[in-house]
């Protein structure tokens, strides 16, 4: 048996987002901060006593990949601190609140598809949360898949059907959502590489009036 027991580095501020995909879910749920928790391991899924935490702010346009990289660094630094505390007898584990616990279950394929009837903020969070993997996608009018890697929130309003391309500029295009309009800045057509929306527009990949997301 290990002298001090076993510890684990978990990429969330426990007890929120226990489970397999805490970074994805933090972005997808529009959280303003995430973090790392060093915890004692027990028989449950991320249910052990918490030893130390560090919080990290989540920017409006931060992606899952960017948050992952930041948490990786913070987690390594925190782990060294905790090991020193344990060896010095200074660690003070704290039990998790079951009432405050949430779970980040395994991602499923159906979660990747964009539902344009949702609010622009929710779709933006999905796109950020699935970048760089697995990627959020929609359907083009020709039935082919289009992954969307980059988006921005806008203050535009429209009465157009959700999924309708309501505007296209030299650099991006704008899609009607259930609430609001989302600016699309980076995409990946089926069987092609990621590209700026500008390149996609210039190639006549999408035009004003097209409706995305239809079967």
Predicted regions and their residues:
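An anion-binding loop in the catalytic cleft
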Residues: 116-215
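Short amphipathic alpha-helical segments
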Residues: 54, 110-112, 180-182
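Acyl-group handling in specialized metabolite and lipid biosynthesis
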Residues: 105-118
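Donor/substrate-binding cores of folate-linked one-carbon enzymes
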Residues: 1-104, 108
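Low-complexity, intrinsically disordered/propeptide-like segments
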Residues: 81, 109-110, 143, 215
């Amino acid at each position: 048996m290990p002298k001090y027991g076993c510890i684990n580095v978990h990429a969330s501020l426990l007890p929120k987002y226990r489970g397999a995909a805490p970074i994805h879910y933090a972005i997808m749920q529009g959280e303003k901060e995430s973090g790392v928790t060093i915890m004692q391991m027990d028989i449950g899924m991320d249910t052990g006593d918490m030893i130390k935490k560090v919080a990290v702010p989540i920017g409006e346009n931060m992606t899952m990949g960017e948050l992952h990289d930041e948490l990786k660094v913070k987690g390594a630094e925190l782990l060294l601190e905790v090991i020193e505390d344990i060896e010095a007898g200074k660690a003070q584990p704290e039990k998790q609140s079951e009432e405050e616990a949430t779970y980040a279950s395994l991602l499923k394929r159906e979660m990747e598809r964009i539902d344009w009837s949702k609010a622009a903020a929710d779709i933006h969070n999905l796109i950020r949360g699935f970048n760089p993997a697995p990627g959020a996608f929609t359907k083009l009018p020709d039935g082919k898949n289009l992954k969307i890697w980059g988006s921005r929130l806008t203050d535009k309003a429209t009465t157009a059907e959700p999924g309708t391309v309501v505007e296209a500029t030299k650099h991006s295009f704008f899609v009607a959502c259930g609430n609001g309009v989302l600016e699309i800045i980076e995409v990946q057509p089926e069987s092609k590489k990621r590209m700026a929306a500008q390149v996609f527009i210039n190639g006549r990949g999408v035009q004003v009036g097209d409706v995305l997301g239809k079967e």
